[in-house]
């Protein structure tokens, strides 16, 4: 069971975007995630008239390593580790600090 999934709200632990929060847009592979508004770089794109591309400077979101983000716990307002518990015969993700189910409406 994956600790971090698409749609989860995460907080960045290290790097240029430390303490910034965002939503996971995608899992790129087992070790990287795309987070909205995090690790955004400017890329210089050459114009290509054949492809109707004007070129210029484009902002692009790059993947960030999964070890550099933690699931955001709204109850504590901090990043938190995740565990797995069986509730009603189903495996669910729970926050380690308070045992609340991840994604449950409070």
Swiss-Prot record:
PROSITE patterns, sorted: RIBOSOMAL_L24
Record GO biological process: translation
Metal-binding listed as a keyword: no
Pfam families hit by this protein: ribosomal_L24 (PF17136)
Any one GO CC term of the record: ribosome
Keywords for the protein's UniProt record, in alphabetical order: Ribonucleoprotein, Ribosomal protein, RNA-binding, rRNA-binding
A GO MF term: structural constituent of ribosome
InterPro entries on file: Rib_uL2_dom2, Ribosomal_uL24, Ribosomal_uL24_CS, Ribosomal_uL24_KOW, Translation_prot_SH3-like_sf
Primary role: One of two assembly initiator proteins, it binds directly to the 5'-end of the 23S rRNA, where it nucleates assembly of the 50S subunit. One of the proteins that surrounds the polypeptide exit tunnel on the outside of the subunit.
Assigned protein family: Belongs to the universal ribosomal protein uL24 family.
Cited HAMAP family: Ribosomal_uL24_B (MF_01326_B)
PANTHER family associated with the record: MITOCHONDRIAL RIBOSOMAL PROTEIN L24
Protein's name according to its UniProt entry: Large ribosomal subunit protein uL24
Organism: Bordetella petrii (strain ATCC BAA-461 / DSM 12804 / CCUG 43448)
């Amino acid at each position: 069971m994956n600790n971090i999934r698409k749609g989860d709200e995460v907080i960045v632990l290290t790097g240029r975007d430390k303490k910034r929060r965002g939503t996971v847009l995608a899992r790129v592979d087992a070790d990287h995630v795309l987070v909205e508004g995090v690790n955004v770089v400017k890329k210089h794109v050459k114009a290509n008239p054949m492809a109707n591309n004007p070129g210029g400077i484009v902002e692009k979101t790059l993947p960030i390593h999964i070890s550099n983000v933690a699931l955001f716990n709204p109850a504590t307002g901090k990043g938190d580790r995740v565990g797995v518990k069986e509730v009603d015969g189903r495996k669910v993700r729970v926050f380690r600090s308070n045992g609340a189910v991840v994604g449950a409406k409070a």
